[in-house]
Amino acid sequence: MCREDWSASIRRRPVRQAVTSDPRARRIRRALLARGSWSETNRVTEILRKETVGGIILLVAAAAALIWANSPWSQSYFALRDFELGGEWLGLHLNLTLGAWAADGLLAIFFLVVGLELKREFVAGDLRDPSRAALPIAAAVGGMVVPALIFVLVNLNTGDGALRGWAIPTATDIAFAVAVLAVISTHLPSALRTFLLTLAVVDDLLAITVIAVFYTDDIKAWALALAVVPLALFTVCAQRGVQKWWLLVPLSVATWVLVHESGVHATVAGVLLGFAVPVHRSATRRGQQVDHAERVGMAEYFEHRVRPISAGIAIPVFAFFAAGVSIGGLSGLSRALGDPITLGIVLGLVAGKPIGILVTTRVLSAVTRASLDSSLRWVDVLGMSMLAGIGFTVSLLIGDLAFGMGSERDEFVKIGVLSGSLLAASLAAIVLLTRNRAYRRIHREETADDDHDGVPDVYQTRQD
């Protein structure tokens, strides 16, 4: 390619990476957090729109739980949370409290969506491209390691099993995060929205791995082996495009029950079921046209139907039962905030997450000699890393697993997660609002459609 053609292509795509025939040079010059394709931007926007609604419902549910747990009627809240429902049938132990049903059962729906997202990202999303996947994966790992190290350092001499909570400040709650973005009304650029979502997806993968490996005690091999049967049948049905819920739901429930009985946390069943669903589907099968659900892929079909249940019911109900903590006034709050476990969680979320994500991103930039996209600044990455410090749903779940629901340390975990998440959200809002004028300008560029063809002009140079 001649110099004039090369320069012209750069002028046509002012915020894209430089084009060169040398693959090694292409990797070197690739911009970090570059704008994605129109189809990918549309998909991310739709997901975050649903998560925003779910995040607002989550905040309302958590606030209601806090108010009730600290009211004169607090005993009725804890009685409701600890009310046992279920029984033991065929040797299966399903006599759980309502709080446990929410944590083990409803969150499995959330992790089913996580599994679908992960499958979609690795097969058809940003994570399928190693050069684009490197940043969110590295950032997620950094955002997990540093908060965990901070928690361990703070609690190194605490003793009595305090270090079991090392993973609590490592999670990111995407629903809470996008609810914060909705409240502050910032016009976040598409590249940052995609980065936040992909980071959260990888973060969820790391979280479920941690839960399965570090918070599983005794395993019943027979139950785990039996769980393979309904999971395999579910996989066959999904691969064949079966959409009959009267068949899929019982298979899903059977998988969940057996995984729960095995000793592995039942939410792992949700991820496995999500992984079983195919992303792509041919437009024809045996020479015949298939319907829209199969044509777009069963993963998208499942996600469109399950995500509203996850965001609107499963996560808010879990938050309602998990966030209720009796603070005990200013003296109780002061005592809780002075506890090493609470302090380790707050520091991990507020300081550890931003440090881990930002430093990892800077190191990746230096190692690959890739500069940040020209429309963005490093303060934008700082704002995103602070927003990732909102660790609510999964952090509360890990706290329950580490110290036991209702224990004194579990109460400290809740105060630490709530305090750390609110502080991280406030700091992120301050940083992002300082850039809102630039975000509005980028938003105008990303939505301008002078030729009125339905695709913003800035995406016209990309092949979707």
Curated annotation (Swiss-Prot):
Protein name in the entry: Na(+)/H(+) antiporter NhaA 2
Alphabetically ordered keywords of this record: Antiport, Cell membrane, Ion transport, Membrane, Sodium, Sodium transport, Transmembrane, Transmembrane helix, Transport
Task: Indicate where this protein is primarily found.
Answer: membrane
What family classification does the UniProt entry report for this protein? Belongs to the NhaA Na(+)/H(+) (TC 2.A.33) antiporter family.
Q: Which domain of life is it from?
A: Bacteria
Q: Name one GO molecular function term.
A: sodium:proton antiporter activity
Q: What does this protein do?
A: Na(+)/H(+) antiporter that extrudes sodium in exchange for external protons.
Task: Tell whether Amino-acid biosynthesis is among the UniProt keywords.
Answer: no
Q: Which GO terms describe its biological process?
A: regulation of pH
This protein's GO CC annotations: plasma membrane
Stretches of the chain forming a coiled coil according to its record = none
Q: Which NCBIfam families match?
A: NhaA
TM region positions: 53-73, 96-116, 134-154, 165-185, 195-215, 219-239, 257-277, 313-333, 340-360, 378-398, 412-432
Q: Which reaction does it catalyse?
A: Na(+)(in) + 2 H(+)(out) = Na(+)(out) + 2 H(+)(in)
Q: According to Swiss-Prot or TrEMBL, what is its membrane topology?
A: Multi-pass membrane protein
* S-S bonds: none
> Which Pfam families does its entry note?
Na_H_antiport_1 (PF06965)
Lineage of the native species? Answer: Bacteria, Bacillati, Actinomycetota, Actinomycetes, Mycobacteriales
Compartments annotated for it: namely: Cell membrane
